[in-house]
From Swiss-Prot:
Species annotation: Lychas mucronatus
GO cellular component: extracellular region
Protein name: Neurtoxin 10
CDD domains: neurotoxins_LC_scorpion
Main location, first listed in the record: secreted
């Protein structure tokens, strides 16, 4: 019974974006360490932002751009720029 509750909480937390499971639902950050927000007035194209960070694809999740298979080292914008210099 306790195991089922623990697994259920883990699934809910991963779906809500509280924790990251195997690189899924990772939020990229801009040069000022802020998240890319979406779902308000001017929506950034999350897929383009995530591809700039080296992820496969991106989407809007809980008003923040979320990337699929985003490498941890590319989560910050400046680390991506530094790699290309």
């Amino acid at each position: 019974m306790k195991f089922c509750v623990a697994v259920s909480l883990l699934i809910i937390a991963s779906m809500a974006g509280v924790i990251s499971v195997s690189g899924y639902d990772v939020y990229p950050r801009d040069y000022a360490e802020n998240y890319y927000y979406c779902g308000v007035r001017k929506d950034p194209d999350c897929s383009k932002i995530c591809k700039l960070h080296g992820a496969r694809v991106g989407y809007c999740h809980v008003k923040r751009c979320s990337c699929v298979d985003l490498p941890e080292k590319n989560q910050n914008f400046l680390s991506v720029i530094w790699k290309h210099c």
